[in-house]
């Protein structure tokens, strides 16, 4: 279960491609994929192994003018989904 | 032990099998109509009694990519495909089944096809009114069923087809890899549409979002979707296909009435 202090990065071998405003994330090791919509795609691209989930939530909160708490909830939910699928990994805590 | 060499070609791509007659001759018999004499990749099959007896079918081996080579290793089998050298070599216990050997040949062919700018695609290919429809979906989605329901129409394959670019667009080519025998008269046709199978109580076509289609098509690209090096190019290639042909969900029952829906919307 990720927390807001976690720093996530894209798992090795995972690739992505934008298509019609959505991001297709392919997990070669599993032969599976995840499709992310606009906001999800932005979060995925911010998972650069440098920023914490908390910092990413701040970016989204400011960019979309949504309450920080809402942005944190959304970022954590997406992080959980991506960790479950093996698309990202925790770099450090 | 008698050695035997035999070459076949799919969509203009040749692949030569070399190995014990007992292992190669069954391919020559089963795939006789695919025989060819061109030079192409070489797949060498080697019996190795020092390997442990197979515990499971080779089909369960996941391709692993190391230093540009594709490795398939499970007890009883040690396969290595070297795309740069255009060669592949499988050492297998003598108890290996023909299906195990065919799996390795198919894996080598998937890499050969991709490196020749084509795509081996987990889909059934059915020709209707001189155009090919590629029916895809997860295992059990109905590829074989839909092929069997398409009576009177040439079936290019019920499991794996080759997509090849041409000056006028993408073509679907038959392969010998399916369970159902491919048409001997019709070996290719221009690709008209990609149809994602959905078993349903009625027949209808529904446009499929392109991002979801891209993901599913990549997931249905055997071997290549397991290669971190080729995966980006795989997505780009499928993106190119999706820019030239439409993709739909095909909701269908166990009847051939879905062709009427296809005619009404795409005919």
What is the predicted function of each stretch?
Chain B
Residues 1-139, 149-156, 161-267:
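A noncatalytic interaction/capping subdomain that flanks phosphate/NTP-handling catalytic cores
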Residues 141-143:
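Conserved glycine(s) of the Walker
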Residues 146:
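Hydrophobic positions on the alpha1 helix immediately C-terminal to the Walker A/P-loop
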């Amino acid at each position: 279960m990720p927390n807001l202090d976690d720093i996530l990065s894209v798992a090795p071998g995972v690739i992505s491609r934008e298509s019609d405003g959505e991001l297709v994330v392919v997990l070669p090791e599993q032969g599976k994929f995840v499709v992310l919509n606009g906001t999800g795609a932005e979060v995925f691209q911010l998972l650069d192994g440098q920023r914490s989930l908390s910092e990413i939530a701040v970016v989204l909160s400011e960019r979309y003018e949504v309450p920080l708490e809402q942005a944190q909830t959304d970022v954590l939910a997406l992080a959980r989904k991506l960790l479950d699928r093996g698309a990202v990994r925790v770099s450090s805590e | 032990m008698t050695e035997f060499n035999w070459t076949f070609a799919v969509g203009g791509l040749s692949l030569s099998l070399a190995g014990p007659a007992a292992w190669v001759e069954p391919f020559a018999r089963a795939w006789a109509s695919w025989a060819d004499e061109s030079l192409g990749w070489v797949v060498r099959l080697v019996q190795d009694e020092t390997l442990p007896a197979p515990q499971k079918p080779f089909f369960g081996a996941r391709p692993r990519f190391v230093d540009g080579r594709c490795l398939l290793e499970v007890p009883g089998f040690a396969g290595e495909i070297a795309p740069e050298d255009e060669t592949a070599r499988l050492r297998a216990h003598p108890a290996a089944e023909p299906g195990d050997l065919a799996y390795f040949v198919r894996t080598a062919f998937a890499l050969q096809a991709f490196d020749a700018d084509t795509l081996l695609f987990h889909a059934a290919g059915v020709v209707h009114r001189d155009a090919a429809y590629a029916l895809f979906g997860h295992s059990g989605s109905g590829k074989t069923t839909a092929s069997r329901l398409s009576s009177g129409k040439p079936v290019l394959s019920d499991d794996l087809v080759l997509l090849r670019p041409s000056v006028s667009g993408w073509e679907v080519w038959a392969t010998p890899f399916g369970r159902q025998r491919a048409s001997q008269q019709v070996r290719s046709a221009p690709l008209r549409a990609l149809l994602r199978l959905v078993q349903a109580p009625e027949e209808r076509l529904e446009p499929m979002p392109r991002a979801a289609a891209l993901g599913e098509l990549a997931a249905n690209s055997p071997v290549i979707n397991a290669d971190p090096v080729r995966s980006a190019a795989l997505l780009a290639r499928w993106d190119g296909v999706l820019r030239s042909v439409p993709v739909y969900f095909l909701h269908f029952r166990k009847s051939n009435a879905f062709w009427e829906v296809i005619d009404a919307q795409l005919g």
